[in-house]
Each structure stands twice: as C-alpha cells, then as structure tokens.
Regions:
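Bacterial Sec-dependent N-terminal signal peptides
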Residues: 1-22
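N-terminal "domain-start" segment that seeds a small globular fold
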Residues: 19-46
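Short loop/turn microsegments at loop-to-beta-strand junctions
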Residues: 29-30, 53-54, 158-160
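Short active-site neighborhood of thiol/selenol oxidoreductases, capturing the structured segment around
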Residues: 45-68, 72-74
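Solvent-exposed, acidic/flexible segments
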Residues: 60, 67, 92, 157, ...
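Structural microenvironment flanking redox-active thiols in thiol-disulfide oxidoreductases
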Residues: 69-125
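Thiol/selenol-based redox catalytic cores and closely related redox-interacting motifs
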Residues: 115-180
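A short, polar/charged loop-to-alpha-helix boundary motif
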Residues: 179-191
Length: 192
C-alpha cells in the first residue's frame, strides 16, 4: 500500500512539474549573487574567475531522503571534485535553519544558498509550484513545506545539476522530473 501511495505522489509530482524544462547544455549560465549558509557572498562571475568550473545543484529540502543522499555523495567526493577545479554550490528554498539541518544530516561543507525569492530557481527554470493535492499528501507524511521553506508558496525545484565552465557556459545538465534520479558523482567527475 505504501508503495502505491509513493507511486501516486511521484505521478502527481511529475504532472506538476511538466512545464519546467531547465536550461540546456551550451547556454550561458544566468549570473547570480547570494549569501551562503556561512554568510559568505557567492557571486557566480567571481567564482568562475578563480575556479575551472562550478557544480550548481538544486535540492528540495532536509526532509527529502533523495536530496540528503545526493548531498552526502557530493560531500564524500568533494576532494575529488575540487581537485578537478570545481566549486560546489547547493540551492534550495528551505530556510537557513533547515539548511543547517541538511548540513547536520549530510556533513556538507560546501556553499548552500537559500533561494528565498526563487531568483536562482527561476533563472535556471527549475522552479515549480505544487498543487494542493500534492501539498496535502506531503502533509500526510509529516512534511510541512510552509514551515520548511518559511512561506506558503509551495514552490520547490526540480532537483537539477549544472556544470558551468570558467567562461560561464553550461557544459553539463542533469534535469530529470523524477526527483529520485540525480547526477552521479562519477558522471560529474567525468564531465569536469
């Protein structure tokens, strides 16, 4: 029964995000400036001057086991990623308090950005708004997006990953509306 419910949630999630397409390989990455979880100013343009590439990924929240697994895998391979000249950034709509919960669960030591106004999510075309049925299903599982994100917008990102080279061009995209599928570290290392 639980498996059927999860399949139903997955189907609703897929229908909800049908309009999102994400950005494509070869496009110029939208520039952004934001503060990370440590208060450090993160400016994409400046990072690309001092790093070979930026690995930019979007995640849903500390309540998502698939997000936590992906973040932990990135953290476990962070030395390999940085050895290839990459700077890793996670972007999420969740509050700073919940970013800290994500960090506690995953031991992430890379920059995590709260995209409070969805500017980055919108620029990368990964934002979607959950319909009321899906919001209520999540609430039934104890997931309160209003509390987690600090608003009642019910907006989440498609869990996408981009590699942006030093020229600002997107050289790799993983964009899958199935929230269970993420870019593997092996794939990222191969693409860097």
């Amino acid at each position: 029964m639980k498996k059927l419910v999860l399949i139903g949630i997955g189907m609703l999630f897929t229908l909800t995000v049908a309009a999102q397409n994400g950005l494509k390989t070869g496009m110029m990455a939208p520039q952004f400036t934001a503060k990370d979880n440590t208060g450090k100013s993160i400016e994409l343009k400046q990072l690309l001057k001092s790093h070979k590439a930026v690995v930019l990924f979007f995640y849903r929240g500390q309540w998502c086991p698939y997000c936590n697994l992906h973040i932990k895998q990135l953290q476990d391979s962070l030395q390999q990623l940085t050895a290839k000249g990459a700077y890793v950034i996670g972007v999420t709509p969740e509050t700073g308090e919940n970013i800290n919960k994500t960090i506690e669960k995953t031991h992430a030591s890379f920059s995590m950005i709260q995209d409070k106004g969805y500017k980055i999510m919108d620029a990368y075309d990964v934002k979607f708004v959950m319909n009321d049925d899906l919001v209520n299903k999540y609430k039934g599982y104890g997931i309160d997006l209003d509390k987690n994100n600090g608003n009642s917008d019910h907006a989440l990102p498609v869990p996408a990953t981009y590699i942006i080279d030093h020229t600002g061009k997107i050289t790799f995209v993983h964009f899958d509306k199935d929230y269970k599928k993420r870019a593997s570290v092996a794939t990222l290392l191969k693409q860097l």
